[in-house]
Amino acid sequence: MNFIDERFERLKKEGKKAFIGYVTFGYPTFEETLWFIKLVYSYVDILEIGFPFSDPIADGEIIQKASIKALSEGVKLSHLFESIEKFKKDKPVVLMLYANTVYKRGIDRFFESCKACGVDGVIIPDVSFEESFEFKEVAEKFGIVYIDLVSISSLERAKMIGRQSRGFLYCVSRKGVTGFKGQIDDRIFTFLKELKTVTSTPLAVGFGIKSKEDVQKFKDLADGIVIGSAIITKIDEGKDKLEDFLKEISESLKDK
């Protein structure tokens, strides 16, 4: 059993759903990023760290701006690995980054570095399920969980992926990019119910979840909630606003 599996098992026993919080590495500045990462890590159950990329196709305006700012700070993948070594303790860390970054470092070298610094899982959003096996094979060799994404646009495809998934299955709550300000697509609720019938892998819902009210909508169906853009926004508002938000979301995920 990997560390991500262990975390979900523990949370299930505690009657709690996983709070998966996302931060962009290098944001708001290179000097401040580790401080904010540590703060978010102290409240979440699983930390997702995004490594900035110049063309982040899955990300909305908020995370795109954060990525551009982080890139202007001159962050490197080696900086990320060094930072993870400094704060990683008793909760899983997942990286989200684009395929070009992995290819640039070399697939074997990338996953070897992940293992060395304590990364538990990796999400590569611009790689399709069919193209993911070259990454999965190497990830497994180094004990890293490769996490699949599924979309409401194709339930049967999602079921196929779900049957083979590990760690948790990242369920995209609607079409589009992260941080979208529109309504959550109601089809996601039936989608989650159907997925539960074919996979025992925990289901984590993300994209556009920004409040405790949004969390409540998914609490009975999902095993975890992914929040990213809303956390970036709270970072912009300062430490106190961020910490209040993290506390509120964490409390809302407890079984009451």
Swiss-Prot record:
GO cellular component term of the entry, any: cytosol
GO MF term list:
tryptophan synthase activity
Q: What class of enzyme is it?
A: lyase
Which Cys-Cys disulphide bridges does the record give? none
The Enzyme Commission number assigned here is 4.2.1.20
Q: In which pathway does it act?
A: Amino-acid biosynthesis; L-tryptophan biosynthesis; L-tryptophan from chorismate: step 5/5
Q: Where are the active-site residues found? A: 48 (proton acceptor), 59 (proton acceptor)
Q: Which Pfam families does the record match to this protein? A: Trp_syntA (PF00290)
Q: Which family does it belong to?
A: Belongs to the TrpA family.
Subunit: Tetramer of two alpha and two beta chains.
Q: Relate the protein's function as given in its record.
A: The alpha subunit is responsible for the aldol cleavage of indoleglycerol phosphate to indole and glyceraldehyde 3-phosphate.
* Name of this chain's protein: Tryptophan synthase alpha chain
Q: Give the species.
A: Caldicellulosiruptor bescii (strain ATCC BAA-1888 / DSM 6725 / KCTC 15123 / Z-1320) (Anaerocellum thermophilum)
Organism lineage string: Bacteria, Bacillati, Bacillota, Bacillota incertae sedis, Caldicellulosiruptorales
